[in-house]
């Protein structure tokens, strides 16, 4: 730190000399960068783990089963809409992405619009969870959470809001238990996994080509799939941008503590990836990515068949136009497999996958779109 202060002081002293030899502009750029960097280092030195807070919206745990916790967010209007909304997030990341930062929280915005919002936290699987299956997650944990919400709200049905992989899970659940789902909202949810142009699908094995990973070998050898492995998979989809380029911009924001904290919150979420229960990972990768069974009507959850034609409830399909993880075509395919005369609505947003949660513009437009759509279907 002392060396950097010395460099700044020396550059200021040498400014007249550099001006004489025509390097004044270059010197000013170097000086500005160094001063910004110094200010940023001071901000970083004053931060600790507790400062990088996520999940700002007040909530209470209303049910727990094994490592799974069901939360209810504290309503902020006197009379919320009667049909509760359950957010079903993916297994591969932590659900606080929907409540990552103040001012851009999907949850907080939905609450302000009068919704009664619940959230499932799947927790962190341990070695003892290696044999958990999709049946355990969907017909077990998820179904039990739905029952608890119905009891608490005195409603026979609820609204599911499934996000990413959680959207795929919600489609499966609503197919198996249509009598418990009043409305279904899916957001950036993969449906047709046979999209070779999408790198995540190729790595998952949708073409079963040279890039396809050997799922059976992985699960048999490791049991649970490490979250660090999944982090690497996601980073390698855009290695230059995600592993290098974004960090070049950090000195520009280090002097602004609010921007720096938002960046660190995102970094915390990106690398906070739970391990995946081995058998669940095996079935999801093989049945969905490698064999595309969802749109073929061949997915089995236990001894029950998932049939998208069972989705007779109103459906809102939200997707990101610039999504590099879930291709728009993958999400849009849902409309081709629904029953005739289904109340089906599609809406897109001009952002990428993560932008659906953190873009300021999307958070101005997305929650009202969901709330308005639901208010017409109570």
UniProtKB/Swiss-Prot annotation:
It catalyses: (3R)-3-hydroxybutanoyl-CoA + [(3R)-hydroxybutanoate](n) = [(3R)-hydroxybutanoate](n+1) + CoA. Its main location: cytoplasm. The keyword DNA-binding does not apply. Pathway: Biopolymer metabolism; poly-(R)-3-hydroxybutanoate biosynthesis. Poly(3-hydroxyalkanoic acids) (PHA), of which PHB is among the most common compounds, are prokaryotic intracellular storage compounds with potential uses as renewable, biodegradable thermoplastics. Cyanobacterial PHB synthesis is particularly attractive as cyanobacteria use CO(2) as the carbon source. One of its GO terms (cellular component) is cytoplasm. Signal peptide: none annotated. Pfam families: Abhydrolase_1. Nitrogen-free medium induces chlorosis in Synechocystis, leading to the degradation of the photosynthetic apparatus and concomitant accumulation of cytoplasmic polyhydroxyalkanoic acid (PHA) granules which in this cyanobacterium are composed of PHB. Belongs to the PHA/PHB synthase family. Type III PhaC subfamily. This is Poly(3-hydroxyalkanoate) polymerase subunit PhaC. The gene is phaC.
